[in-house]
């Protein structure tokens, strides 16, 4: 397990773009993608890939839960297998199945403990060039 990112919920794509440009001095355009299971769109900063911007859809539970505020929402750890997220237990997971997310990630959340929301992230398998069946490769 290793640190992957922090997720910041912001009110809109324009707020995320402004934060990136003005505060992080990252002028690369954010590339947004949907996470349908969580009713939101997300993007990672090019310059600071450890920061994820989350913009919930109007009907998302995040809007009701957070009252429309911009907040630090979660911390995420990369694990080998999101269904068996060692050192955590599968019984600690909120959802029965992981959700597909941007950049080929699979994600799930652990049941909150003392208010801290933790996401577990499984990165896509990379293939070795010239050997499409080999894990750890580059296609």
Spans of model-derived segments:
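Loop/turn position at the start of each blade in beta-propeller repeats
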Residues: 1, 38, 70, 103-105
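Long, hydrophobic N-terminal alpha-helical segment
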Residues: 1-38
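Vicinal oxygen chelate
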Residues: 2-12, 42-46, 51-53, 63-139
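Non-catalytic surface loops within mature trypsin-like serine protease
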Residues: 12, 57, 79-81, 114, ...
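Generic secondary-structure microfeatures
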Residues: 24, 47-49, 55-58, 79-81
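Amide-forming acyltransferase catalytic core, primarily the GNAT-like/NAT-type
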Residues: 28-36, 40-44, 56-62, 139
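A cross-kingdom feature marking solvent-exposed beta-strand/loop segments within repeated
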Residues: 35-36, 58-64, 71-73, 94-96, ...
């Amino acid at each position: 397990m290793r640190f992957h990112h922090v997720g910041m919920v912001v009110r809109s794509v324009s707020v995320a773009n402004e934060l990136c440009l003005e505060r992080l001095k990252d002028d690369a355009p954010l590339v947004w993608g949907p996470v349908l299971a969580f009713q939101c769109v997300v993007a990672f900063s090019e310059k600071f890939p450890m920061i994820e911007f989350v913009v919930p859809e109007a009907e998302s539970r995040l809007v009701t839960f957070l009252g429309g505020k911009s907040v630090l929402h979660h911390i995420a750890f990369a694990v080998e297998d999101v269904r068996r997220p060692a050192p955590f237990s599968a019984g600690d997971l909120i959802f029965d199945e992981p959700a597909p997310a941007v950049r080929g990630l699979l994600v799930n959340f652990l049941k909150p403990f003392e208010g801290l929301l933790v996401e577990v992230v499984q990165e896509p398998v990379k293939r070795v060039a010239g050997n499409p069946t080999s894990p750890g490769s580059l296609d």
